[in-house]
Amino acid sequence: MKYLTKSRVIATIAMLGCLSVSAWAETPTNQPESLTDKALKHEKLGVVVESANHKFAEKYRLQYDSWKATAESTDRSSALEADPRLVVLWAGYAFAKEYNKPRGHYYAVTDVREILRTGAPKDENDGPQPMACWTCKGPDVPRLIEEKGERGYFDPKWAKYGAEIVNSIGCADCHDTTSKAFEEGKPALRVARPHVLRALESVGWRFEDLDKHGKRVAVCSNCHVEYYFKDKKDVTFPWAKGVDVDSIEKYYDESQFTDWTHALSKAPMLKTQHPDFEVWSQGVHGKNGVTCIDCHMPKVKDKDGKVYTEHKIGNPFDRFDATCKTCHEQSKQTLQDRVKEHKAQVKEAMIRLEDQIVKAHFEAKVAWDAGATAEEMQDILMAIRHAQWRWDYSAAGHGNHFHAPDVMLHTIATGLDRVADARAKLGVVLTKHGVETPIVMPDISTREKAQKAVGIDIAKDQAAKDEFLRTVVPQWERQARERGLLPEVTPKSVTTPKVDAK
């Protein structure tokens, strides 16, 4: 393997699982109050956010067209159909209704509108979800937070600003698009979500003190992180004790936070989001200063030889010469085979853990039905919580098997330990209450059968969602066009620029 092109190395504080900023920091100078300082005081940042993506199409044509090409990632296949165990793991939570495989940034707003999890609100005060569900979906979010303040943004229901959040993840999520530097063609990277600035500060990643490589990672942490809704409203990163699986679990346990109570086992559950920043930081690439941008947004050339940053975020192997080959001497096939092997190992272990947790949930329900007491079940439910947290920390990320396969295998192994403890104790409780073991497990071989087993009526939810998409969403888009947040005519096609690796 060649020497890495970057000399900077992230130092990991093992005790806390925190990241050290020292290797990524620039020497600060006397400057006016920073955005981080304002965020820490919960003040408005005083920024201008031009959130309409289409307004940058002409000046930054190469970047814009490559960003727009994320629309080619159209596969929205159901993860619940591929693995019906997920329905049981999330029983009682909206993810058990619909959970699809991720697709391109271009669809961020469309997908959150259409997913069953956001319900079918009839007006701005209706629906099951808070505004927080929009927070990662596009640059209209930091614009609204600046206009309304954090309370004005986070307090309402999800439907309140449906006509305002219409631009999918784009330019102003990462760039200060109104700055002189951006006008001159410089990156002008910026984080304009106050809660993200506070979270970065909590792990020593003060945004203003980061060098350009650190800032490239930090803008991705706007969204590619684990988070929860504090007080069921505010997007919060649970990093106060560190970013590894044990530190975040400890944070949640000590704050007595629960995403939901499981419909079968009654365990106080946690739902991991997508801890990509956290897992990357623990892996070989993160520890050696290789950033998200290096692998997913490399420098490429257009047909005339002009160099620009590829914004069609995707698999690094699709741009092998511009990504992997800048550090590795091995062939593309060799590296692909290695990644495939890691993925298979992690997936196999993950399925084993899923199987055990599913059984634990059903066994716990039988125990409750047989008359088990809260005292008898207390330790069992916490073991189930911890086992599933470890499974989800491994499963919810994008490419965890690549970013840190050793960390994932260790995390899953500790999850297997926790669920083994839960099931051993369940065996004792079941026997005590006269239940023969093993219990009879229901058929969960398909998504439909699994949803029936946990009592979900999808037909009713889908009918309501269809009506919402037919009546409410067109009104949102009409209002957005009137305000200039969307172009008057939606582009009919997507042009992918032809590029060669630099």
UniProtKB/Swiss-Prot annotation:
A Gene Ontology term for the protein's cellular component: outer membrane-bounded periplasmic space
Pfam family for this entry, one: Cytochrom_C552
Binding site for substrate: 227, 274
Binding site residues for heme c 4: 292, 295-296, 403
Associated pathway: Nitrogen metabolism; nitrate reduction (assimilation)
Enzyme class: oxidoreductase
Binding site for heme c 2: 171, 174-175, 311
Parts forming coiled coils: none
PROSITE patterns to which the protein is assigned, alphabetical: MULTIHEME_CYTC
InterPro entries found in the cross-reference section: Cyt_c552, Cyt_c_NO2Rdtase_formate-dep, Multihaem_cyt_sf
Cellular compartment(s): Periplasm
Region (Disordered): 481-502
Binding site for heme c 3: 105, 220, 223-224
UniProt binding sites for Ca(2+): 226-227, 271, 273
Family per record: Belongs to the cytochrome c-552 family.
PANTHER family hit by this protein: CYTOCHROME C-552, CYTOCHROME C-552 RESPIRATORY NITRITE REDUCTASE
Functional description taken from the UniProt entry: Catalyzes the reduction of nitrite to ammonia, consuming six electrons in the process.
HAMAP family according to UniProt: Cytochrom_C552
Protein name (record): Cytochrome c-552
